[in-house]
């Protein structure tokens, strides 16, 4: 099923990815999207949301650094994207960390139909209402089953769920996949998950099956990180960051197929 031709479609079509993202990761997200052949726009003024929704091929909403004006812009953009039939991705950064973040995410989920939600296990557990000890915006620890969390959120909100970790878990509520790739250096650079959300969005912009797009995006991204680590003389995050950008710029269907470790199942048992 996963032939990774979605990767080629991103190069061919150069989708316009509208990011309403946080101030920590905006530059890296934009550069990462450019590296894979997508076209980023980082507009966040509420006055331009309707126009941007008509232009963009996908909208990615990231709650990393919130304020009231930005939340208003997110809601306007999300509703406009729904009307336009544009895919919308939510990255609920640190949703379990504060009551304000939980409130904002619940409002966004109530007002916008998201094509996909991507976060770490702690963030998705918070959305699912499962017990989890979050550590700020990091995943933290918990005893809930990650597959069950993915299934619950996917079915409750009619969306694809992507839970990032040592093994990524992807589900649309009926289909499940695990991606067992990735460099250990990825979580040591800030914004690697935020960029993955944007990359998933770019794949959804050119592939109607959001589940397939998500699996192929996660695998391609993780494999690129492995190739980046191979090139390093010193396995350190400062060296890894630019090397990873280069790996994204030089990724290919053949490279990804050669290393991708995907386990797919039709149901969660």
Curated annotation (Swiss-Prot):
It comes from the Bacteria. Substrate binds at residues 42, 191. It is an enzyme of class 2 (transferase). One of its GO terms (biological process) is thiamine diphosphate biosynthetic process. Gene3D superfamilies: 3.40.1190.20. Keywords: ATP-binding, Kinase, Magnesium, Metal-binding, Nucleotide-binding, Thiamine biosynthesis, Transferase. Coiled coil: none annotated. Its EC number is 2.7.1.50. It holds the Pfam family HK. Its cofactor is Mg(2+). HAMAP family: Thz_kinase (MF_00228). Belongs to the Thz kinase family. This is Hydroxyethylthiazole kinase. The lineage of its organism: Bacteria, Bacillati, Bacillota, Bacilli, Bacillales.
């Amino acid at each position: 099923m996963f032939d990774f031709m979605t990767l080629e479609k991103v190069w061919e079509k150069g989708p316009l990815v509208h990011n309403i993202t946080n101030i920590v990761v905006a530059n890296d997200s934009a550069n990462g999207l450019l590296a894979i052949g997508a076209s980023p726009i980082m507009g966040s003024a509420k006055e331009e949301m309707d126009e941007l929704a008509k232009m963009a091929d996908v909208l990615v909403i990231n709650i990393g650094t919130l304020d009231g004006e930005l939340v208003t812009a997110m809601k306007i953009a999300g509703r406009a994207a729904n009307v336009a039939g544009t895919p919308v991705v939510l990255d609920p950064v640190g949703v379990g960390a504060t009551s304000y973040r939980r409130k904002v995410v619940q409002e966004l989920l109530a007002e916008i139909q998201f094509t996909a939600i991507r976060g770490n296990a702690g963030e998705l557990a918070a959305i699912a209402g499962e017990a989890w000890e979050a550590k700020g915006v990091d995943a933290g620890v918990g005893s809930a089953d990650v597959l069950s969390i993915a299934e619950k959120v996917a079915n409750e909100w009619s969306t694809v769920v992507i839970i990032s970790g040592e093994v990524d878990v992807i589900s649309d509520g009926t289909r499940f996949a695990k991606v067992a790739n990735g460099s250990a250096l990825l979580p040591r650079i800030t914004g690697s998950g935020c960029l993955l959300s944007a990359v998933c969005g770019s794949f959804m912009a050119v592939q109607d099956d959001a589940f397939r797009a998500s699996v192929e995006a996660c695998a391609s991204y993780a494999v690129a990180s492995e190739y980046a680590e191979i090139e390093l003389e010193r396995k350190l995050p400062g060296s890894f960051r630019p090397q990873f950008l280069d790996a994204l710029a030089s990724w290919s269907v053949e490279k990804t197929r050669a290393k991708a470790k995907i386990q797919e199942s039709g149901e969660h048992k």
